[in-house]
Each structure stands twice: as structure tokens, then as C-alpha cells.
Curated annotation (Swiss-Prot):
Domain of life from the UniProt record: Bacteria
InterPro entries xrefs: Ribosomal_protein_uL29 (IPR050063), Ribosomal_uL29 (IPR001854), Ribosomal_uL29_sf (IPR036049)
Keywords from the UniProt entry: Ribonucleoprotein, Ribosomal protein
Annotated protein name in UniProt: Large ribosomal subunit protein uL29
Pfam families the UniProt entry points to: Ribosomal_L29 (PF00831)
Protein family according to the UniProt entry: Belongs to the universal ribosomal protein uL29 family.
Matching CDD domains: Ribosomal_L29_HIP
GO biological-process terms attached to the record: translation
Organism listed in the record: Hyphomonas neptunium (strain ATCC 15444)
GO MF, any single term: structural constituent of ribosome
CC terms in the record's Gene Ontology section: cytosolic large ribosomal subunit
Amino acid sequence: MKAADVRSKSVDQLSDELVKLKKEQFNLRFQAATGQLEKTGRVTEVRRDIARVKTILREKSQAGK
């Protein structure tokens, strides 16, 4: 997910995306623990996407003040 894609979304969409990414991260952690994880790079990718979404949410909340 690119930062430009994230910036174009509304706050509600970003919140939904954050919930979805956190669920995916949870599932990936369990897959890794049980040895079922095939794409290990996806863990890093999801973690960075979560950081991107949180950063943009914070920027948007700061801009509103």
C-alpha cells in the first residue's frame, strides 16, 4: 500500500483499514507460530502498512486542530 493511496482515504476508511490490518497481523502471527506461514515478508509488509495508516490518521487529526 502506497502512502498516496492512504492519504486519499477518509478518516473512517482509514480506521476500517487499520482494523483489517490488525486482524491480518494477528492471523499472520498465529500462522508463524504454528509453522504454517508461507510468505514471511507479509508480516513486515503488514506492520509497515499499519504504521503508514496510523501516521496518516495522526496527520489528519493534527490538521483538524
